[in-house]
Design a protein with these regions (language model features):
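Acidic, histidine-bearing metal-coordination/catalytic regions of metal-dependent phosphoesterases
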Residues: 1-31, 50, 172-213, 229, ...
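Conserved beta-sheet core of the metallophosphoesterase superfamily
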Residues: 99-213
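N-terminal acidic leader/helix
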Residues: 214-223
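Charged, low-complexity interaction regions
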Residues: 223-231, 242-245
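Amphipathic alpha-helical interaction modules
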Residues: 234-238
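Short, charged early-sequence alpha-helical segments and their helix-coil boundaries
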Residues: 242-260, 264-266
Length: 268
């Protein structure tokens, strides 16, 4: 395979709710879809040649139906490179014509890429997976899905905690909206070199003030009660009644036991 391998996720082309014209839930700052598509096309093509292979880790198009096919075909053909799609939860193609716009469309893939001059196994998935294939042997995992949300914060914290606990994992969120990705596909070397220095990371990855203690308590309880599920674990740690609560109420109760911390408030 000639050309470089590059990676990006969660473009959400055609999705007005990631712009200010909709709900702006990603805080991308674009006033509308036209502006977003123009900026993404410019930054993408400045970073990608037609010899490159771009792995899009899910959620590339919004409402990819027959009505929107020619519009999306034009958008994708305007982006340089050979495009490989790892399926996300929003990649629901109503017609097989969309499959012709990509080199492949698959739910999961493993590739080999260069990092610091050495070959590395790279796990590609839309979803975060802490115990991915070959994580003990130095493999790297790239994913999307959680955007720059509270869920993404928790993934970072969990990854850091697992490494401290002796479960090695190198996991990177390559969502296009993150400041270090900035809407352009990036090489593995660039991702690893810039991820910890991104504005998102320095803002979100402070000491968790109780999060690690909570997770450690859950892990310890599971070790001593392997026959019990997650809800039963919460019952054992926090008292009876969790199983009858909604997920949100259960989380609020968990938070109340951790303490009144700024990072916890984001979840609760």
């Amino acid at each position: 395979m000639s050309g470089r391998k590059l990676y990006i996720a969660d473009l959400h082309l055609g999705h007005s709710n990631v712009t200010r014209a909709g709900k702006d839930f990603d805080k991308r700052g674009f006033k509308d879809l036209n502006e977003m598509h123009e900026v993404i096309t410019m930054k993408w093509n400045n970073a990608v040649t037609n010899a490159d292979h771009v792995y899009i880790l899910g959620d590339v198009l919004w409402k990819a139906n027959s009505k929107n096919y020619y519009y999306y075909r034009s958008l994708l053909k305007g982006l340089n490179g050979n495009k490989h799609l790892i399926l996300g939860n929003h990649d629901n193609f109503s017609t097989n014509r969309y499959r012709k716009l990509f080199e492949e469309i698959i739910p999961y893939k493993e590739v080999v890429d260069k990092l610091n001059g050495e070959n590395k196994r790279v796990i590609l998935s839309h979803y975060y997976m802490p115990f991915y294939n070959h994580h003990y042997r130095g493999a790297v995992m790239l994913h999307g899905h959680s955007h720059n949300s509270a869920e993404s914060d928790m993934e970072r914290r969990l990854t850091a905690m697992l490494n401290r606990q002796g479960f090695p994992c190198q996991i990177y969120n390559v969502g296009c909206m993150h400041s270090y990705i900035d809407y352009a596909p990036r090489t593995l070397q660039y991702i690893v070199d810039h991820y910890d220095n991104s504005a998102d990371y320095s803002r979100n990855a402070r000491e968790d003030d109780g999060f690690e203690d909570m997770i450690q308590a859950l892990l310890d309880y599971h070790k001593s009660h392997p026959d019990k599920g997650f809800i039963q674990t919460l019952n054992g740690l926090l008292g009876d009644g969790i199983s009858s609560m909604t997920d949100k109420t259960a989380v609020q109760k968990i938070c109340s036991h951790i303490g009144n911390h700024s990072e916890v408030k984001k979840i609760c």
